[in-house]
From Swiss-Prot:
<keyword id="KW-0460">Magnesium</keyword>
<keyword id="KW-0819">tRNA processing</keyword>
<dbReference type="Pfam" id="PF01715">
    <property type="entry name" value="IPPT"/>
</dbReference>
<comment type="subunit">
    <text>Monomer.</text>
</comment>
<comment type="similarity">
    <text>Belongs to the IPP transferase family.</text>
</comment>
<keyword id="KW-0547">Nucleotide-binding</keyword>
<feature type="binding site">
    <location>
        <begin position="9"/>
        <end position="16"/>
    </location>
    <ligand>
        <name>ATP</name>
    </ligand>
</feature>
<comment type="function">
    <text>Catalyzes the transfer of a dimethylallyl group onto the adenine at position 37 in tRNAs that read codons beginning with uridine, leading to the formation of N6-(dimethylallyl)adenosine (i(6)A).</text>
</comment>
<protein>
    <recommendedName>
        <fullName>tRNA dimethylallyltransferase</fullName>
        <ecNumber>2.5.1.75</ecNumber>
    </recommendedName>
</protein>
<dbReference type="InterPro" id="IPR039657">
    <property type="entry name" value="Dimethylallyltransferase"/>
</dbReference>
<feature type="site" description="Interaction with substrate tRNA">
    <location>
        <position position="99"/>
    </location>
</feature>
<keyword id="KW-0808">Transferase</keyword>
<dbReference type="GO" id="GO:0052381">
    <property type="term" value="F:tRNA dimethylallyltransferase activity"/>
</dbReference>
<dbReference type="InterPro" id="IPR027417">
    <property type="entry name" value="P-loop_NTPase"/>
</dbReference>
<feature type="binding site">
    <location>
        <begin position="11"/>
        <end position="16"/>
    </location>
    <ligand>
        <name>substrate</name>
    </ligand>
</feature>
<dbReference type="GO" id="GO:0005524">
    <property type="term" value="F:ATP binding"/>
</dbReference>
<keyword id="KW-0067">ATP-binding</keyword>
Length: 300
């Protein structure tokens, strides 16, 4: 029976490194499920693997233009193609990354909520731009009290929840419960890497300094030159908003580093809680050695 291995966890938890080791030992192919590492214009700021440094096949990295609003459904289609190709080669597909929506779509399947009409999508976006996050959030929970579970800074999910209740009159959360969903694959193993938080926070801080010392500033300058709207997903990758503020003389580089590091640490903190709440039956590992021991037994 074909197996699919999923390695996820908070940002900077070491997912990429351990996935390479597992792939080397198990004739594997690494397939990306990070929603920002898909964009080809921002390999440094999104910490995409340096493919010239490994002989392991990597798929779905840096293959979408940042000028495109790429959906979860599109990614699922691309993922299926790569998975089935891996099966035909008798290799182990190793899906790795930390994007919650991508992981959820694998484990629980895609939502069957009807497509949103273009005029509702446009009106919702205009309203969001006018009100800003907090006021828009307040308006949303008036219409859909269940949406209180969302964070007011998660603009993508706020917009999605508002669009759905505007079009259907029903909460997106209610629809997700009512509409039948099933996993993308029949046989998968979900492993979540959760190192000690202080270890992850230090890696986050060090990684951003390393990016600044490389050519990440030029990378963001090139991104700005494409005149991409600020609400496009690529523009929200961790560190990009802060570097843009620096490049537009709104804050110093020191302040940009401080804010970017703090925001990314806060994101990692939320990820720890989210993974445990969303996937209580997953296999959780604090150390890479623990995970490697399990994999060696599972796939020997």
């Amino acid at each position: 029976m074909n197996n699919v291995l999923i390695i996820t966890g908070p940002t900077a938890s070491g997912k990429s490194k351990i996935s390479i080791k597992i792939a080397q030992d198990n004739n594997g192919v690494i397939i990306n499920c990070d929603s920002k590492q898909i964009y080809k214009e921002i390999p440094i700021i999104t910490d995409q693997p340096k493919l010239n440094e490994t002989f392991i096949p990597h798929k779905l990295y840096g293959y979408v233009s940042a000028v495109k609003q790429y959906s979860v459904a599109e990614w699922v289609n691309d993922l299926k193609r790569e998975i089935y190709q891996t099966f035909t080669e008798n290799k182990l597909p190793i899906i790795t990354g930390g994007s919650g929506m991508y992981i959820s779509s694998i484990i629980y399947g895609l939502s069957q909520i009807p497509a949103i009409e273009e005029n509702i999508r446009y009106q919702t976006k205009q309203l969001f731009n006018t009100l800003g996050n907090k006021e828009f959030y307040s308006l949303l929970i008036e219409k859909d009290p269940i949406a209180k579970r969302l964070h007011y800074n998660n603009s993508y999910q706020l917009l999605r929840a508002y669009e759905v209740i505007e079009q259907t009159g029903t909460s997106i959360f209610r629809l997700q419960e009512e509409l039948k969903r099933k996993p993308l694959f029949d046989n998968f193993t979900l492993c979540i890497l959760v190192p000690q938080r202080q270890e992850v926070y230090k890696k986050i801080n060090d990684r951003f300094i390393s990016m600044i010392n490389s050519s990440v500033i030029e990378e963001v300058k090139n991104l700005i030159s494409l005149n991409i709207p600020n609400h496009f997903p690529a523009m929200k990758a961790h560190g990009i908003p802060e570097i843009i503020q620096y490049l537009t003389n709104k804050i110093s580089i020191e302040k940009a580093i401080e804010i970017a590091q703090r925001n990314t640490r806060h994101y990692a903190k939320r990820q720890y809680t989210w993974f445990k709440n969303q996937f209580p039956n997953a296999l959780f590992y604090e150390s890479q050695d623990q995970l490697l021991k399990f994999i060696s037994k599972k796939f020997k």
